[in-house]
Amino acid sequence: MKKLVVLGLAMAMTASMVSGVSALPVQAADGEGLKVALLLSGAANDQGWNQTAYEGTQKACEKYGYELAYTENVEVADISAAFADYASAGYDVVIGHGYEFGDPALEVAETYPDTKFICTEADASADNVASYVMACEQSAYVVGIIAASMTESDKLGAIGPIPGDSLVKIINGYEDGAKSVNPDIEVQTAWTNSFVDTQLAQEAAKAMIDNGVDVIKHCANACGNGAMAAAVDAGIWCQGDSYDQSSLAPDNILDSALYNLDVVLDTALGSIADGSFEGEVYNLGMADGAVEVLLSDNLPEDVKATAQDAIDKIVSGEIEVERDYTLRD
Protein backbone atom coordinates (compact mmCIF):
# COMPACT_ATOMS: atom_id res chain seq x y z
CA MET A 1 0.00 0.00 0.00
CA LYS A 2 1.24 3.46 -0.82
CA LYS A 3 2.21 5.75 2.00
CA LEU A 4 -0.57 8.26 2.62
CA VAL A 5 0.04 11.97 2.39
CA VAL A 6 -0.33 13.52 5.80
CA LEU A 7 -1.95 16.91 6.01
CA GLY A 8 -1.97 19.34 8.90
CA LEU A 9 1.80 19.63 9.11
CA ALA A 10 1.54 22.98 10.80
CA MET A 11 0.10 21.23 13.81
CA ALA A 12 2.42 18.26 13.90
CA MET A 13 5.79 18.97 12.31
CA THR A 14 8.88 17.61 14.06
CA ALA A 15 12.53 17.37 13.09
CA SER A 16 12.55 13.61 12.76
CA MET A 17 9.43 11.85 11.56
CA VAL A 18 5.81 12.86 11.23
CA SER A 19 3.37 10.16 10.20
CA GLY A 20 3.91 9.86 6.45
CA VAL A 21 6.37 12.77 6.33
CA SER A 22 10.09 12.10 6.40
CA ALA A 23 12.31 14.84 7.75
CA LEU A 24 15.94 14.35 6.88
CA PRO A 25 18.53 16.07 9.07
CA VAL A 26 21.45 17.37 7.03
CA GLN A 27 24.84 18.47 8.26
CA ALA A 28 25.08 22.22 8.65
CA ALA A 29 27.30 24.11 6.26
CA ASP A 30 27.90 27.76 5.49
CA GLY A 31 24.52 29.18 4.53
CA GLU A 32 21.32 30.68 5.84
CA GLY A 33 19.95 27.46 7.31
CA LEU A 34 16.70 27.72 5.38
CA LYS A 35 14.06 25.01 5.64
CA VAL A 36 13.40 23.16 2.39
CA ALA A 37 10.64 20.63 1.69
CA LEU A 38 10.41 18.22 -1.24
CA LEU A 39 7.19 16.69 -2.57
CA LEU A 40 7.48 13.43 -4.53
CA SER A 41 4.90 11.56 -6.58
CA GLY A 42 6.40 8.20 -5.59
CA ALA A 43 8.87 6.62 -3.22
CA ALA A 44 12.21 8.28 -2.50
CA ASN A 45 13.95 4.94 -3.11
CA ASP A 46 12.23 4.02 -6.40
CA GLN A 47 15.56 3.72 -8.28
CA GLY A 48 14.20 6.24 -10.74
CA TRP A 49 12.47 9.60 -11.11
CA ASN A 50 11.85 10.26 -7.43
CA GLN A 51 15.10 8.91 -6.06
CA THR A 52 17.18 11.12 -8.33
CA ALA A 53 15.24 14.16 -7.08
CA TYR A 54 15.56 13.11 -3.46
CA GLU A 55 19.30 12.56 -3.74
CA GLY A 56 19.78 15.75 -5.76
CA THR A 57 17.88 17.85 -3.23
CA GLN A 58 19.76 16.24 -0.36
CA LYS A 59 23.09 17.05 -2.00
CA ALA A 60 22.14 20.67 -2.66
CA CYS A 61 20.81 21.15 0.87
CA GLU A 62 24.02 19.78 2.33
CA LYS A 63 26.01 22.20 0.17
CA TYR A 64 24.03 25.27 1.23
CA GLY A 65 23.38 24.27 4.84
CA TYR A 66 19.61 23.94 4.42
CA GLU A 67 17.33 21.67 6.43
CA LEU A 68 15.43 19.14 4.31
CA ALA A 69 12.10 17.38 4.80
CA TYR A 70 10.22 15.38 2.19
CA THR A 71 6.89 13.73 1.55
CA GLU A 72 6.54 10.67 -0.66
CA ASN A 73 3.65 9.34 -2.74
CA VAL A 74 1.79 12.63 -3.04
CA GLU A 75 -1.43 12.12 -4.97
CA VAL A 76 -2.34 14.78 -7.54
CA ALA A 77 -5.49 15.67 -5.60
CA ASP A 78 -3.39 16.36 -2.49
CA ILE A 79 -0.64 18.51 -4.02
CA SER A 80 -2.12 21.91 -3.14
CA ALA A 81 -2.72 20.88 0.45
CA ALA A 82 0.80 19.46 0.76
CA PHE A 83 2.31 22.70 -0.56
CA ALA A 84 0.18 24.75 1.83
CA ASP A 85 0.98 22.59 4.83
CA TYR A 86 4.72 23.03 4.43
CA ALA A 87 4.37 26.76 3.73
CA SER A 88 2.17 27.28 6.78
CA ALA A 89 4.65 25.28 8.87
CA GLY A 90 7.33 27.86 8.15
CA TYR A 91 9.27 26.20 5.34
CA ASP A 92 11.13 28.73 3.22
CA VAL A 93 11.25 26.68 0.02
CA VAL A 94 8.90 23.94 -1.19
CA ILE A 95 9.86 21.85 -4.21
CA GLY A 96 7.37 19.88 -6.31
CA HIS A 97 9.00 17.25 -8.50
CA GLY A 98 7.05 16.81 -11.72
CA TYR A 99 4.91 18.70 -14.21
CA GLU A 100 1.77 18.02 -12.17
CA PHE A 101 3.03 20.26 -9.35
CA GLY A 102 3.03 23.43 -11.47
CA ASP A 103 -0.58 24.63 -11.29
CA PRO A 104 -0.97 23.81 -7.57
CA ALA A 105 2.23 25.75 -6.83
CA LEU A 106 0.81 28.83 -8.55
CA GLU A 107 -2.42 28.47 -6.61
CA VAL A 108 -0.77 28.17 -3.20
CA ALA A 109 1.96 30.74 -3.91
CA GLU A 110 -0.59 33.56 -3.87
CA THR A 111 -1.44 32.78 -0.25
CA TYR A 112 2.21 32.43 0.85
CA PRO A 113 4.16 35.21 -0.91
CA ASP A 114 7.14 34.82 1.44
CA THR A 115 7.62 31.16 0.54
CA LYS A 116 9.49 30.22 -2.62
CA PHE A 117 8.08 27.38 -4.71
CA ILE A 118 10.21 25.42 -7.16
CA CYS A 119 8.84 22.94 -9.69
CA THR A 120 10.54 20.59 -12.10
CA GLU A 121 9.17 19.95 -15.58
CA ALA A 122 6.39 22.53 -15.14
CA ASP A 123 5.46 25.68 -17.02
CA ALA A 124 4.76 27.69 -13.89
CA SER A 125 6.21 31.04 -12.88
CA ALA A 126 5.30 33.91 -10.58
CA ASP A 127 7.16 36.27 -8.26
CA ASN A 128 7.80 33.39 -5.86
CA VAL A 129 7.49 30.42 -8.27
CA ALA A 130 10.26 29.14 -10.54
CA SER A 131 10.25 26.06 -12.75
CA TYR A 132 13.15 24.08 -14.16
CA VAL A 133 12.50 22.10 -17.33
CA MET A 134 14.99 19.48 -18.46
CA ALA A 135 15.56 18.69 -22.12
CA CYS A 136 14.69 15.04 -21.57
CA GLU A 137 13.88 14.77 -25.27
CA GLN A 138 17.62 15.04 -25.94
CA SER A 139 18.51 11.93 -23.97
CA ALA A 140 15.43 10.19 -25.39
CA TYR A 141 16.65 10.92 -28.92
CA VAL A 142 19.97 9.21 -28.21
CA VAL A 143 18.21 6.29 -26.55
CA GLY A 144 16.04 5.96 -29.67
CA ILE A 145 19.14 5.79 -31.85
CA ILE A 146 20.48 3.01 -29.64
CA ALA A 147 17.21 1.07 -29.76
CA ALA A 148 17.00 1.32 -33.54
CA SER A 149 20.59 0.11 -33.78
CA MET A 150 19.92 -2.95 -31.61
CA THR A 151 16.48 -4.16 -32.72
CA GLU A 152 16.17 -7.16 -35.01
CA SER A 153 12.41 -6.93 -35.48
CA ASP A 154 12.28 -3.18 -36.21
CA LYS A 155 9.61 -2.94 -33.53
CA LEU A 156 10.27 -0.85 -30.42
CA GLY A 157 8.13 -0.33 -27.33
CA ALA A 158 7.78 2.85 -25.27
CA ILE A 159 5.83 2.91 -22.01
CA GLY A 160 4.85 6.06 -20.12
CA PRO A 161 2.68 6.74 -17.07
CA ILE A 162 0.34 9.65 -17.82
CA PRO A 163 0.51 11.55 -21.14
CA GLY A 164 1.54 14.90 -19.70
CA ASP A 165 3.84 17.21 -21.63
CA SER A 166 7.02 16.18 -19.82
CA LEU A 167 6.40 12.52 -20.66
CA VAL A 168 5.08 13.01 -24.19
CA LYS A 169 8.23 14.92 -25.18
CA ILE A 170 10.30 11.90 -24.10
CA ILE A 171 8.29 9.39 -26.12
CA ASN A 172 8.40 11.67 -29.17
CA GLY A 173 12.13 12.29 -28.80
CA TYR A 174 12.65 8.53 -28.60
CA GLU A 175 10.66 7.95 -31.78
CA ASP A 176 12.50 10.75 -33.60
CA GLY A 177 15.87 9.31 -32.62
CA ALA A 178 14.88 5.83 -33.73
CA LYS A 179 13.54 7.08 -37.06
CA SER A 180 16.75 9.00 -37.70
CA VAL A 181 18.30 5.54 -38.04
CA ASN A 182 15.39 3.79 -39.75
CA PRO A 183 12.46 5.91 -40.96
CA ASP A 184 10.31 2.79 -41.27
CA ILE A 185 10.81 1.56 -37.72
CA GLU A 186 7.67 0.94 -35.66
CA VAL A 187 7.33 2.42 -32.17
CA GLN A 188 4.48 0.99 -30.12
CA THR A 189 3.38 3.23 -27.24
CA ALA A 190 1.39 2.50 -24.08
CA TRP A 191 0.30 4.71 -21.19
CA THR A 192 -0.35 3.02 -17.84
CA ASN A 193 -2.08 5.98 -16.12
CA SER A 194 0.00 5.17 -13.05
CA PHE A 195 3.38 6.25 -11.75
CA VAL A 196 3.75 3.35 -9.32
CA ASP A 197 1.82 0.23 -10.42
CA THR A 198 4.54 -2.06 -11.78
CA GLN A 199 2.03 -4.70 -12.84
CA LEU A 200 0.41 -2.34 -15.34
CA ALA A 201 3.73 -1.64 -17.06
CA GLN A 202 4.62 -5.31 -17.00
CA GLU A 203 1.35 -6.22 -18.69
CA ALA A 204 1.80 -3.49 -21.30
CA ALA A 205 5.33 -4.69 -22.01
CA LYS A 206 4.21 -8.30 -22.35
CA ALA A 207 1.57 -7.27 -24.89
CA MET A 208 4.22 -5.43 -26.88
CA ILE A 209 6.58 -8.40 -26.74
CA ASP A 210 3.79 -10.66 -27.99
CA ASN A 211 3.44 -8.19 -30.87
CA GLY A 212 7.07 -8.51 -31.90
CA VAL A 213 8.78 -5.76 -29.90
CA ASP A 214 12.35 -6.66 -28.98
CA VAL A 215 13.50 -3.41 -27.29
CA ILE A 216 11.46 -1.67 -24.59
CA LYS A 217 12.04 1.81 -23.18
CA HIS A 218 10.06 3.32 -20.32
CA CYS A 219 9.68 6.73 -18.72
CA ALA A 220 7.11 5.60 -16.18
CA ASN A 221 8.78 6.19 -12.81
CA ALA A 222 8.54 3.17 -10.49
CA CYS A 223 5.77 1.77 -12.67
CA GLY A 224 8.33 1.30 -15.43
CA ASN A 225 10.28 -1.19 -13.36
CA GLY A 226 7.58 -3.68 -14.35
CA ALA A 227 8.39 -3.14 -18.02
CA MET A 228 12.02 -3.92 -17.35
CA ALA A 229 11.02 -7.07 -15.48
CA ALA A 230 8.97 -8.18 -18.49
CA ALA A 231 11.95 -7.59 -20.77
CA VAL A 232 14.17 -9.69 -18.53
CA ASP A 233 11.61 -12.50 -18.46
CA ALA A 234 11.36 -12.45 -22.26
CA GLY A 235 15.09 -12.16 -22.83
CA ILE A 236 14.88 -8.91 -24.82
CA TRP A 237 16.60 -5.55 -24.49
CA CYS A 238 15.35 -2.77 -22.23
CA GLN A 239 16.28 0.84 -21.50
CA GLY A 240 16.21 2.53 -18.11
CA ASP A 241 15.05 6.00 -17.18
CA SER A 242 15.87 8.77 -14.70
CA TYR A 243 18.48 6.80 -12.76
CA ASP A 244 21.12 4.15 -13.37
CA GLN A 245 18.76 1.17 -13.60
CA SER A 246 21.35 -1.41 -14.62
CA SER A 247 20.82 -3.33 -11.38
CA LEU A 248 17.23 -4.07 -12.45
CA ALA A 249 18.29 -5.80 -15.66
CA PRO A 250 22.07 -6.24 -15.73
CA ASP A 251 22.12 -8.58 -18.74
CA ASN A 252 19.35 -6.88 -20.70
CA ILE A 253 19.84 -3.15 -20.26
CA LEU A 254 21.21 -1.04 -23.09
CA ASP A 255 21.31 2.36 -21.41
CA SER A 256 19.74 4.63 -18.82
CA ALA A 257 18.56 8.14 -19.59
CA LEU A 258 19.76 10.14 -16.59
CA TYR A 259 18.13 13.29 -15.26
CA ASN A 260 20.71 14.94 -13.06
CA LEU A 261 18.53 16.61 -10.47
CA ASP A 262 21.60 17.43 -8.41
CA VAL A 263 22.56 19.88 -11.17
CA VAL A 264 19.01 21.21 -11.51
CA LEU A 265 18.36 21.67 -7.81
CA ASP A 266 21.82 23.04 -7.09
CA THR A 267 21.02 25.69 -9.69
CA ALA A 268 17.62 26.37 -8.12
CA LEU A 269 18.68 26.43 -4.48
CA GLY A 270 21.90 28.22 -5.36
CA SER A 271 19.87 31.11 -6.75
CA ILE A 272 18.21 31.42 -3.36
CA ALA A 273 21.54 31.25 -1.56
CA ASP A 274 23.07 34.05 -3.62
CA GLY A 275 19.93 36.17 -3.82
CA SER A 276 19.46 35.86 -7.58
CA PHE A 277 16.18 33.91 -7.47
CA GLU A 278 13.66 35.04 -10.07
CA GLY A 279 10.27 33.53 -10.82
CA GLU A 280 10.86 32.25 -14.32
CA VAL A 281 10.82 29.02 -16.33
CA TYR A 282 14.37 27.80 -16.93
CA ASN A 283 15.51 25.21 -19.48
CA LEU A 284 18.48 22.94 -18.85
CA GLY A 285 19.82 20.28 -21.20
CA MET A 286 22.79 18.11 -22.07
CA ALA A 287 25.09 21.10 -22.48
CA ASP A 288 24.26 22.11 -18.89
CA GLY A 289 24.82 18.61 -17.51
CA ALA A 290 21.15 18.27 -16.58
CA VAL A 291 20.49 15.24 -18.79
CA GLU A 292 22.78 12.52 -20.08
CA VAL A 293 22.78 8.92 -21.28
CA LEU A 294 24.59 6.18 -19.40
CA LEU A 295 25.74 3.56 -21.91
CA SER A 296 25.75 -0.09 -20.86
CA ASP A 297 28.62 -2.47 -21.42
CA ASN A 298 26.04 -4.68 -23.15
CA LEU A 299 26.28 -2.36 -26.16
CA PRO A 300 28.61 -3.23 -29.04
CA GLU A 301 31.42 -0.74 -29.50
CA ASP A 302 30.07 0.54 -32.81
CA VAL A 303 26.70 1.36 -31.25
CA LYS A 304 28.43 3.08 -28.34
CA ALA A 305 30.37 5.17 -30.84
CA THR A 306 27.19 6.07 -32.73
CA ALA A 307 25.46 7.09 -29.50
CA GLN A 308 28.44 9.14 -28.31
CA ASP A 309 28.60 10.92 -31.67
CA ALA A 310 24.94 11.90 -31.30
CA ILE A 311 25.55 13.09 -27.74
CA ASP A 312 28.49 15.23 -28.84
CA LYS A 313 26.46 16.77 -31.66
CA ILE A 314 23.54 17.57 -29.37
CA VAL A 315 25.86 19.26 -26.88
CA SER A 316 27.55 21.27 -29.65
CA GLY A 317 24.22 22.23 -31.20
CA GLU A 318 24.84 20.42 -34.48
CA ILE A 319 21.82 18.23 -33.74
CA GLU A 320 18.78 20.12 -32.49
CA VAL A 321 16.20 17.78 -30.98
CA GLU A 322 12.64 18.99 -31.34
CA ARG A 323 10.62 19.34 -28.15
CA ASP A 324 7.25 18.02 -29.29
CA TYR A 325 4.34 17.91 -26.84
CA THR A 326 1.95 16.46 -29.44
CA LEU A 327 0.35 13.17 -28.46
CA ARG A 328 1.04 11.20 -31.62
CA ASP A 329 -1.11 8.39 -32.99
Go through each PLM region and give its residues.
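Hydrophobic core
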Residues: 9-17
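N-terminal regions of proteins, emphasizing targeting and processing segments when present
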Residues: 9-10, 22, 297
